[in-house]
Regions:
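Transmembrane-helix boundary motif in ABC transporter permease subunits
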Residues: 2-10, 79-111, 128, 167-170, ...
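C-terminal transmembrane helix and the adjacent membrane-cytosol boundary/short C-terminal tail
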Residues: 2-19, 159-174, 180-189, 242-274
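Membrane-interfacial helix termini and adjacent extracytoplasmic/periplasmic loops
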Residues: 3-7, 46, 50, 55, ...
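Interhelical loop and adjacent transmembrane-helix boundary motif
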Residues: 6-13, 43, 58-66, 208-258, ...
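Transmembrane alpha-helices
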Residues: 19-20, 25-32, 123, 148, ...
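Hydrophobic alpha-helical transmembrane segments of multipass integral membrane proteins
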Residues: 26, 68, 72, 76-88, ...
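Short membrane-interfacial helix/loop motifs at transmembrane-helix boundaries
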Residues: 30-65, 215-220, 274
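Loop-to-helix entry region at the N-terminal start of transmembrane alpha-helices
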Residues: 69-76, 128-153, 157, 193-195, ...
Length: 274
């Protein structure tokens, strides 16, 4: 807030900083904003100015067998990879948070390494691993590797939630005769649920938008929506790609709003525990 006691230099800095932040934000979102109007263009090319308003390219998207197959594949792969990432990521986060053993930092670095290793390296390594097994072009390999990419997000969000977890609740449940499984299901899991769901949403978004690994591991029958968009850009540049991109943008916005809601809920739960 602008203070009435600011000097002229402080006022210039105040407004300059906000203008700079606005320009950076515009630079980041402008490519996204550019693609949306093109999806409603009545013309057959991805060019400005727009020739008119039309929903033809959305109709083409939903009427195309190739686009629908790629969408179906994404709906198969992303939820399956998310479930795997959520289960293994949550268990790993609990073990790494509560455990105290030699090499703990090294193990943590290894399990979150897919976040920092270039995806193309993961794609090549995955292909060299699965291809000799005859699983190079299969949903199995695609789901497993997508889950590996999503696990670090779950570990980080769940670990952050566990930092404010009151372990006296677990001890109290155990003292009342609850088994470890019952304690986890009825005490631990409800309290760390915002972190688990947040990580799962990140894992889902990562899998749903991933294209590099998919290029290495997916055949024509396993092509996901991002790969179909990539192929369309190379082979047949059509505004249908803009329609697909707009749908992905809308989906991403919904995910971000959901994550923000979960973050607020997590803060309330943490405050209530204190």
């Amino acid at each position: 807030m602008l203070s009435p006691y600011m000097s002229p230099v402080e006022r210039v800095w105040f407004y300059s900083l906000r203008i700079l932040c606005g320009l950076i934000l515009l630079f980041l979102i402008l490519p996204v904003l550019v693609i949306v109007p093109l999806s409603f263009n009545s013309g057959s090319f991805l060019v400005y100015p727009l020739q008119g308003f039309s929903l033809h390219w959305y109709q083409d998207f939903f009427a195309s067998a190739e686009w629908m197959r790629s969408l179906k594949n994404s709906i198969i792969v992303a939820p399956a990879a998310t479930v795997l990432a959520m289960v293994f990521g949550t268990l790993a986060a609990i073990g790494l948070t509560r455990g105290d053993f030699p090499g703990k930092s090294l193990v943590m670095a290894l399990v979150i390494s897919p976040m920092v290793v270039p995806v193309v390296i993961i794609g090549v390594a995955s292909y060299l691993f699965f291809a000799p097994l005859g699983l190079g072009n299969s949903f199995f390999s695609l789901i497993v590797v997508h889950a590996v990419l999503g696990v670090p997000f779950v570990i980080i969000t769940v670990s952050a939630t566990l930092q404010g977890f009151n372990h006296n609740l677990v001890r109290a449940a155990a003292s009342l005769g609850a088994s470890p499984l019952t304690t986890f299901r009825r005490v631990t899991l409800p309290l760390i649920a915002p972190g688990v769901i947040s990580g799962a949403l990140f894992a889902f978004a990562t899998s749903f938008d991933e294209v590099v690994v998919t290029l290495f591991l997916a055949g024509p029958e396993q092509a996901t929506l991002p790969r179909q968009m990539f192929s369309g850009i190379r082979e047949n540049l059509s505004p249908t790609i803009a329609a697909a991109a707009t749908l992905l943008i809308a989906f991403s916005v919904i995910l971000l709003l959901t994550l923000e809601w979960l973050r607020g809920r997590s803060e309330k739960l943490r405050t209530a525990q204190v």
